[in-house]
């Protein structure tokens, strides 16, 4: 199961101080919001932090959510800070492993 973190409100993707501290602990390096925003949104530690903290991971400009993907492909589309996770329509395609 692949999961992706995204921001579900206008404002922008950002993590609370508590979430940044926990993510930094998991990663073993000091992260700020800029560095955390460079992580892939499917990063397992990021998903773990958002899952564990729930609303405590949010800031005044973010409402973080997690989407489970049906395939290993996704794109995040952002408008005014609000994000949508989009998966391609792959029905009928054959995947070579």
Question: Where do the model's predicted regions map?
Answer:
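Catalytic phosphate/metal-binding cores of nucleic-acid and nucleotide-processing enzymes, i.e., regions
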Residues: 2-96
